[in-house]
């Protein structure tokens, strides 16, 4: 998972104005970096110009995903990432950056601003911090831990059963479970297997 670009634009009519951008082109060869960076800026600008105010979208281009968020006040953000990067985390980043940007940069500077004149230095920090979505986004971290716990629980249950033994056989032989509990287990098992086939 990788983030390549994080940019802030003002969606003017008809052109979008680049206000600030951060790039991570370290994975490209030295001679390709400036061209790749220019192409990312061009693509981001084009996506903002063609997106409606108050919208969010993800646009696929080869193995990359461009996530765009255009606010109703014409401030827009674009993240370019690989296709494995979680969309939810990308949009969380965009929302955070645009909120921060709108508080730090005066609104009258947006239509006439440029990367040289806008004083907002947090983009590089956000780009590097969000390279690992699990560390940057608490929900991703919790989801990853939950997935690991599910795997451990599944492996533990499987390891408790002896070779060739099935949970159904253990339930039917159990002296601890009452008749009603056994009937409940069988009914639940049938319903779950029915849904799994569909």
Curated annotation (Swiss-Prot):
Q: Does the keyword Protein transport apply?
A: yes
Write down the SMART domains for this protein, in alphabetical order.
Longin (SM01270)
Where is the protein found, in the record's own terms? Cytoplasm, Cytosol; Cytoplasmic vesicle membrane; Golgi apparatus membrane
Q: Which UniProt keywords apply?
A: Coiled coil, Cytoplasm, Cytoplasmic vesicle, ER-Golgi transport, Golgi apparatus, Lipoprotein, Membrane, Methylation, Palmitate, Phosphoprotein, Prenylation, Protein transport, Transferase, Transport
Boundaries of every v-SNARE coiled-coil homology domain copy: 138-198
Q: Taking every annotated instance into account, which residue ranges of this chain make up the domain Longin?
A: 8-131
- Bilayer topology term: Lipid-anchor
User: What is a single molecular function from GO for this protein?
Assistant: SNAP receptor activity
Q: Where is the lipid attached (S-palmitoyl cysteine)?
A: 194
Question: Residues bearing Cysteine methyl ester?
Answer: 195
| Mutagenesis or variant effect for residue 42 to E | Mistargeted to Golgi and plasma membrane. Normally targeted to vesicular structures
Propeptide ranges, please?
Answer: 196-198
Reading the lineage from the top rank, the first entry is Eukaryota
Tissue specificity note: Highly expressed by neurons in brain and faintly detected in spleen, lung and kidney (at protein level). Ubiquitously expressed.
Extract one GO BP annotation from the record.
vesicle docking involved in exocytosis
Q: What is the effect of changing residue 8 to D?
A: Mistargeted to Golgi and plasma membrane. Normally targeted to vesicular structures
Lipid-substituted positions (S-farnesyl cysteine): 195
Query: Is the keyword Transmembrane helix assigned to this protein?
Result: no
Q: Name one cellular component (GO) term.
A: cytosol
Q: What is its EC number?
A: 2.3.1.-
Q: What does this protein do?
A: Vesicular soluble NSF attachment protein receptor (v-SNARE) mediating vesicle docking and fusion to a specific acceptor cellular compartment. Functions in endoplasmic reticulum to Golgi transport; as part of a SNARE complex composed of GOSR1, GOSR2 and STX5. Functions in early/recycling endosome to TGN transport; as part of a SNARE complex composed of BET1L, GOSR1 and STX5. Has a S-palmitoyl transferase activity.
Show the domain comment.
The longin domain regulates palmitoylation and membrane targeting.
Protein name, as recorded: Synaptobrevin homolog YKT6
Name its species: Rattus norvegicus (Rat)
Gene assigned in the entry = Ykt6
């Amino acid at each position: 998972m990788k983030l390549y670009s994080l940019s802030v634009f003002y969606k003017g009519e008809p052109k979008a104005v680049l206000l600030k951008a951060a790039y991570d082109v370290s994975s490209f060869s030295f001679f390709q970096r400036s061209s790749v960076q220019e192409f990312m800026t061009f693509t981001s600008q084009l996506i903002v110009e063609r997106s409606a105010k108050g919208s969010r979208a993800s646009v696929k281009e080869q193995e990359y995903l461009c996530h765009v968020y255009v606010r109703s006040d014409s401030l827009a953000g674009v993240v370019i990432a690989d296709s494995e990067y979680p969309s939810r985390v990308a949009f969380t980043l965009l929302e955070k950056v645009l909120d921060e940007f709108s508080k730090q940069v005066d609104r009258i500077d947006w239509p006439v601003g440029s990367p040289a004149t806008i004083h907002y230095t947090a983009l590089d920090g956000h780009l590097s911090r969000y390279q690992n979505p699990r560390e940057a986004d608490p929900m991703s971290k919790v989801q990853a831990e939950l997935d690991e716990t599910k795997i451990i629980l599944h492996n533990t249950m499987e390891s408790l059963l002896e070779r060739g033994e099935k949970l159904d056989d253990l339930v039917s032989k159990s002296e601890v479970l009452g008749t009603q509990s056994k009937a409940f287990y069988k009914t639940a098992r049938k319903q779950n297997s029915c849904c799994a086939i569909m």
